[in-house]
């Protein structure tokens, strides 16, 4: 098992929590980001700046039982299909049961924006968001039976 972080748009406190909890539970943490981001990590993969390049690398790295951290609903759906667990930076676990709704909502908002409409962006990140993420990740790490990693 490994933690894979879609680090292109990952808040620093989330990345820090992943690194700390990965160390605490002896789970390797892989970060994937374009060359525009400076990430300090033992296992960092730099990708180009092309559209979806980081997402494709995350998908290719992901194996059954891994934990993926992303705010991209499309990427979340893909890694769930590979048997991974997936958590948002605000600590919400993505599940197969809620992906259809999230992807439909994303499509509706995209259509509205293409038609010239506006959609509400995410609210400002709070300290509570950071704590919720850390608690959620630790809870999921504790629930996964340990097995050796390569």
From Swiss-Prot:
Coiled coil: none annotated. Pfam families: DUF188. It comes from the Bacteria. HAMAP family: UPF0178 (MF_00489). Belongs to the UPF0178 family. This is UPF0178 protein Swol_1505. It comes from Syntrophomonas wolfei subsp. wolfei (strain DSM 2245B / Goettingen).
């Amino acid at each position: 098992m490994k933690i894979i972080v879609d680090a292109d748009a990952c808040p620093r406190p989330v990345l820090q929590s992943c690194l700390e909890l990965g160390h605490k539970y002896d789970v390797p943490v892989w970060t994937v980001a374009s060359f525009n981001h400076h990430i300090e990590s033992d296992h960092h993969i730099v990708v180009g700046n092309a559209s979806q390049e980081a997402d494709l690398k995350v998908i290719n790295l992901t194996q059954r039982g891994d934990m993926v951290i992303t705010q991209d609903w499309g990427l979340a759906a893909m890694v769930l299909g590979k048997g991974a667990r997936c958590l948002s930076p605000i600590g919400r676990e993505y599940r197969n049961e809620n992906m259809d709704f999230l992807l439909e909502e994303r499509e509706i908002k995209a259509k509205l924006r293409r038609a010239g409409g506006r959609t509400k962006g995410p609210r400002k990140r709070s300290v509570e968001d950071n704590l919720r993420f850390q608690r959620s990740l630790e809870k999921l790490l504790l629930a996964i039976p340990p097995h050796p990693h390569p």
